[in-house]
Amino acid sequence: NNFFHYLLLDNLLLVDIYNRAKKLHVEVTAPRAVFLIETRLEKDNIVTELLKGMFSSQGGDYITAVDETNVILIKTLDQAVTYENLCDVARTIVAMMNAEAMLNVRVAFGTVVQELKDVSKSYKEAKLALDVGKIFYAERNVVAYSTLGIGRLIYQLPVNLCRIFIEEIFGDNLPIDLDEETLTTINKFFDNNLNVSETSRQLFVHRNTL
């Protein structure tokens, strides 16, 4: 467990990764993705236990944690894995936590990596997906790094740059309190990656009105 903890946090030298993986009989080369399960409460052991019942180290899957609210699944995958396969894993976790423990969890996952040393990259992507998802896709309980779209770009902009942009656009009339209709429109706009035509179609309004 400590090995994967340090691996995710980039606290191991490359030679140490290979040496410890050999001792622990962990495959160095295999397609893997990191799934981050947020319990929204302080981490409960039941989440870890349920995950251990669903995924086993014999199948190349490993469960660990790096903080108090998130549990991490490092899942070994087939070479022909697809984005939809990853979504199925995430949706299964959400459904199981809800059915077995009545827990409302959010699951984020990173991209597939082929080398053990790159697992930390998938973890960082999953963590970013979780953070961005809370802001731009709050209604989703499954968030993929590869589908963050414009939300990821905006999230990574410096705060000062965002503040200057807002002041230039709105002047003194900052939109602090937005009505529900406006918020719905904005969220739908982001959902469609700023595609005006598709957003106006889904909201049943003319594109000029939008």
What do the predicted segments below correspond to?
Residues N2, Y6-T209:
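Cytosolic nucleotide-utilizing catalytic cores of signal-transduction proteins
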